[in-house]
Curated annotation (Swiss-Prot):
Intermediate capsid protein that self assembles to form an icosahedral capsid with a T=13 symmetry, which consists of 230 trimers of VP6, with channels at each of its five-fold vertices. This capsid constitutes the middle concentric layer of the viral mature particle. The innermost VP2 capsid and the intermediate VP6 capsid remain intact following cell entry to protect the dsRNA from degradation and to prevent unfavorable antiviral responses in the host cell during all the replication cycle of the virus. One of its GO terms (biological process) is fusion of virus membrane with host plasma membrane. This is Intermediate capsid protein VP6. It comes from Rotavirus A (strain RVA/Human/Indonesia/69M/1980/G8P4[10]) (RV-A). Ca(2+) binds at N266, D286. Gene3D superfamilies: 2.60.120.170, Viral capsid alpha domain. InterPro entries: Capsid_hemagglutn, Rotavirus_A/C_VP6, Virus_capsid_a-hlx_vir. It is found in: Virion. Belongs to the rotavirus VP6 family. One of its GO terms (molecular function) is metal ion binding. The keyword Aminoacyl-tRNA synthetase does not apply. Residues 62-73 are annotated as: Interaction with the inner capsid protein VP2.
Length: 397
């Protein structure tokens, strides 16, 4: 994997900097590194593909070295370099694709394709190493079963979940009370509602709670907490739990009271925030508990009182909500996030070449399925294919 990254980094630099008119002295170190890559690869043969519709390709290396010059690089020099660069880039691209479409239930962190296994040989250690990639650093740590740490922006840690629970219900569905939520990606939105606006509740107050368990521990997380759930702020028709009918939800938004958010790790509270909105932090956690209240306004203007009558029919439904958004966090496991395209890169290659479903990943690389059942085998394989995808993205956009 280190060699593949170093190849890709060398080729990217060469493609960007070996251009007509450039002073040789400005790229002499790069050309020396480029020539070392050629010397190391010359005389070797590789084969990629042969799975799904990914075609078998044979690769043979026997390229001449780039020479020295006292002047600027001319068109002939650059054309010679380009022919070599293009072949190497095509090779790296195919090695990456060959690796991204393979999986293994055992030791999935290790190279799975013949070509990448061959590049792990001692001969190729002479290629200049560049381990500045976070993915490469963590792949090396995971390969040695040491602790890893990925920094994510808006990590996709929450499997998609959208539903509701009713604490009070009737066959007519005309006086309901309960919670509804949408968990997806890095965001939780939860709303508590009471058609009667807590008219008969103790102290005219309804208590709501929403607990979300993460599939992996997050650390040093920066989080946004807002006293609103905009996705539940407009009327909608909702299917009943048994699917026999539908019911109407017509929210009128109130501000939640006594808001508390707890971050827990193995059942122990690590951080607690009460009535604090905006940016908060959490040290480490695997569970989030949100609690909040809907309180009937003690004083109402006639217009507000008309919204919340003391008896049925209740045409407007008192609603309070919260939004919790994980802006950034560190996780020992690899995740999809908002700042990278690794999941899309891997998935698109597997779809394009009709790769058959293997023993580890779900069909279509369904992220909700993958993260819901995030086994050690899936974690190893995902880290490997994401690392390869990060290498490929240096050369192929």
């Amino acid at each position: 994997m280190d060699v593949l990254y170093s190849l890709s980094k060398t080729l990217k630099d060469a493609r960007d900097k070996i251009v007509e008119g450039t002073l040789y002295s400005n790229v002499s170190d790069l050309i020396q590194q480029f020539n070392q890559m050629i010397i190391t690869m010359n005389g070797t043969e590789f084969q990629t593909g042969g799975i799904g519709n990914l075609p078998i390709r044979n690769w043979n290396f026997g390229f001449g070295l780039l020479g020295t010059t006292l002047l600027n690089l001319d068109a002939n020099y650059v054309e010679t370099a380009r022919n070599t660069i293009d072949y190497f880039v095509d090779f790296v691209d195919n090695v990456c694709m060959d690796e991204m479409v393979r999986e293994s239930q055992r030791n999935g962190i290790a190279p799975q394709s013949d070509s990448l296994r061959k590049l792990s040989g001692i001969k190729f250690k002479r290629i200049n190493f560049d381990n500045s990639s976070e993915y490469i650093e963590n792949w090396n740590l995971q390969n040695r079963r040491q602790r890893t740490g990925f920094t994510f922006h808006k990590p996709n840690i929450f499997p998609y979940s959208a539903s509701f629970t009713l604490n009070r219900s009737q066959p007519a569905h005309d006086n309901l009370m309960g919670t509804m939520w949408l968990n997806a990606g890095s965001e939780i939105q939860v709303a508590g509602f009471d058609y009667s606006c807590a008219i008969n509740a103790p102290a005219n107050t309804q208590q709501f709670e929403h607990i979300v368990q993460l599939r992996r521990v997050l650390t040093t997380a920066t989080i946004t907490l807002l006293p609103d759930a905009e996705r539940f702020s407009f009327p909608r028709v909702i299917n009943s739990a048994d699917g026999a009918t539908t019911w109407y939800f017509n929210p009128v938004i109130l501000r939640p009271n006594n808001v508390e958010v707890e971050f827990l790790l193995n059942g122990q509270i690590i951080n607690t925030y009460q009535a604090r909105f905006g940016t908060i932090i959490a040290r480490n956690f695997d569970t989030i508990r949100l609690s909040f209240q809907l309180m009937r306004p003690p004083n109402m203007t006639p217009a507000v009182a008309a919204l919340f009558p003391n008896a049925q029919p209740f045409e407007h439904h008192a609603t309070v909500g919260l939004t919790l958004r994980i802006e950034s966090a560190v996780c020992e496991s690899v995740l999809a996030d908002a700042s990278e395209t690794m999941l899309a890169n891997v998935t698109s290659v597997r779809q394009e070449y009709a790769i058959p479903v293997g023993p580890v990943f779900p069909p279509g690389m369904n992220w909700t399925d993958l993260i819901t059942n995030y086994s050690p085998s899936r974690e190893d394989n995902l880290q490997r294919v994401f690392t390869v995808a990060s290498i490929r993205s240096m050369l192929v956009k």
